[in-house]
Amino acid sequence: VQPRVVFVEPAAMTAWSNVDRSSLTELRAVIATEGHDIAGAITLTESLMHAPVPILNMSPTEVAVFIFTSGTAGSPKAAMLTHNNLHSNLVQISQENVLRNSDVVYGVLPLFHIFGLNVVLGYTLFVGATVVLVQRFDPSTALETFAERGVTVVPGAPQVWSALAQMPDDECKVLSQLR
């Protein structure tokens, strides 16, 4: 499997600089998520200004992503999920009507886990809602983001809610806008 596009965030720039790109024969673009510090890369904003890429007619049984398991029963393994696997999961989730297209979802869960990728990002886009992606959780910054961006839904691990519960009451008024 060869990547065609690679997204590189600031925290991964050192790792990316050590990759032997001569072996990436299918690579067509490197997109820097912030700044323009990577030779030959374009910014995420620049990538969105290009003409739309034609939609490919993919087989539902083709592998769409490799998601690594947590490794609780040994070493992490690459689970191959097809386009149909991902789409079926989105359809199943949408039957619960959890999100509305007017929602703004706080996306702090990692996208290299299936919940972050397909529930937080995928389902949000599937219903036409907005997702605010952040790299790291900080309770003070999160509360500011909730207020500034009008966040209405926060999928999060127990540690997120525990940290928010420790914040002073006067800073937590914005939590009343969450559903």
Question: What are these language model-derived features?
Answer:
Residues 8-18, 137-138, 151-179:
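Adenylate-forming
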Residues 55, 67, 140-143, 170-172:
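Short hydrophobic/charged patches on amphipathic alpha-helices used for structural packing
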Residues 6, 63, 69-72, 105, ...:
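Conserved S/T- and glycine-rich ATP-binding loop of Class I adenylate-forming
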